[in-house]
Amino acid sequence: MVAELEFEKPLIELRKKISELKEFMKSTDVDLSSEIEKLEARLAKLENDIYANLTPWDRVQIARHPNRPTTLDYIERLFTHFLECHGDRCFGDDEAIVGGIAKYDGLPVTVIGHQRGKDTKENIRRNFGMPHPEGYRKALRLMKQAEKFQRPIICFIDTKGAYPGKAAEERGQSEAIARNLFEMAGLTVPIVCIVIGEGGSGGALALGVGNHIHMLENSTYSVISPEGAAAILWKDASLAQRAAETMKITANDLKELGVIDEIIPEVRGGAHRDVDQQAAEIDKVLKRSLKQLLKLDGETLVQQRYEKFKQIGQFAFSRDDIWVR
C-alpha cells in the first residue's frame, strides 16, 4: 500500500468512493458505470491540478516518501552483473552506502549510492541512509578502483546528510567528506551523479562532484534541511515550509541556477508510483550523459568538472542594485 501525503488528502476520498462503487457494482446488478466515469474524470482533473502546482514543501514530502525507490531499486533495474563491494579497508563496512561493479548496457561501470531502508529494521541497519566516515571511504576506494580500470562512475544521491554522531566525528567525518570532494575533482573517468531523493548537505556532496549532475523532478538538494534552516534563521523548526520556499532546493530552482544539468521527469505523483517507469526515465538521461562523456579524455574530464564547479555560487547584479553610501 502506498502511503498518502498531506497534500494528497483531497484525492483519498474520491479514490475511496470510486473503489466502493466498483465493489458494489460487482456484487449487485446495478449499473453505476456512468457515475464511476464522472468520478474518475473528476479525480483525474484534481490530480492534474495538484501535481501541476506542487510547492517546494510538497516536493520535500515526495522526496522523503517511505516508498520512494532507493539506489538498490535502480541498480536492480538499470544494471546487470552487479557485484557489491564491502568495507573501507580501514574500519568497517557502512551499509548506508552501497557500491560495486556492474555492467550498464554492456559497459563495465562502478555504481555507488546512499541507501535508505524500506522498514524500521532495515533503516536502523542502514542508519536511515546517513553515512559514517567509513561509508565515504568505501565510496572513495571504489572510485579510485574505477579510475585504475577506467570505468565510468555513476553515483545515486539520497541522504538527509552525513551522520553527525560522536563516533562518526571521532573517526573523521569532516575529513572523509573533504577527501572525497578533493579526490573526485581529479578523477580521470566520467562521473555522472543523480539525486534520486533528498540531497542533504556535505553528506550528499561527498558523492556529488560529477561531470554531469541530474535530479529527479521531485528530489531536493540543499546545504541543510528546511527544518534545520528554520531552526537557525527563525528559531522555530515548524517554519520548515517557509524555509523550503526560500532556499531554492527544488530541481527547477537548481537547474535555473546552473547547479544541475538536467531534470529527470517523474511519473505523476512521484517515483514511488511506478518504479519501472521511473528507472526507464533515468535510463534515457544516463545513456545520453555517458555517450557524451565517454568521448572525452581524462584531462578534459577533469577540466570540465573544474569549470563546472567554479561557476556554482557566482552571482550577478545590475548597476541599479549597487547602493553607494
UniProtKB/Swiss-Prot annotation:
Positions of the CoA carboxyltransferase C-terminal domain: 35-292
EC nos: 2.1.3.15
GO cellular component, one term: acetyl-CoA carboxylase complex
Domain of life: Bacteria
SUPFAM superfamilies hit by this protein: ClpP/crotonase (SSF52096)
InterPro entries, per the entry: Acetyl_CoA_COase_a_su, ClpP/crotonase-like_dom_sf, COA_CT_C
Gene Ontology molecular function, alphabetical: acetyl-CoA carboxylase activity; ATP binding; carboxyl- or carbamoyltransferase activity
Any Pfam family the entry gives: ACCA
Cytoplasm in keyword set: yes
GO biological process: one example: malonyl-CoA biosynthetic process
PROSITE patterns membership: COA_CT_CTER
Location in the cell: Cytoplasm
This protein's record includes keyword Lipid metabolism: yes
Metabolic or biological pathway: Lipid metabolism; malonyl-CoA biosynthesis; malonyl-CoA from acetyl-CoA: step 1/1
Record keywords: ATP-binding, Cytoplasm, Fatty acid biosynthesis, Fatty acid metabolism, Lipid biosynthesis, Lipid metabolism, Nucleotide-binding, Transferase
Enzyme class: transferase
Catalytic activity: N(6)-carboxybiotinyl-L-lysyl-[protein] + acetyl-CoA = N(6)-biotinyl-L-lysyl-[protein] + malonyl-CoA
Family: Belongs to the AccA family.
HAMAP family: AcetylCoA_CT_alpha
Subunit structure: Acetyl-CoA carboxylase is a heterohexamer composed of biotin carboxyl carrier protein (AccB), biotin carboxylase (AccC) and two subunits each of ACCase subunit alpha (AccA) and ACCase subunit beta (AccD).
NCBIfam families according to UniProt: accA, AccA_sub, PRK05724.1
Functional note: Component of the acetyl coenzyme A carboxylase (ACC) complex. First, biotin carboxylase catalyzes the carboxylation of biotin on its carrier protein (BCCP) and then the CO(2) group is transferred by the carboxyltransferase to acetyl-CoA to form malonyl-CoA.
Name the UniProt record assigns to this protein: Acetyl-coenzyme A carboxylase carboxyl transferase subunit alpha
UniProt organism field: Geobacillus sp. (strain WCH70)
Phylogenetic lineage: Bacteria, Bacillati, Bacillota, Bacilli, Bacillales
Encoding gene per record: accA
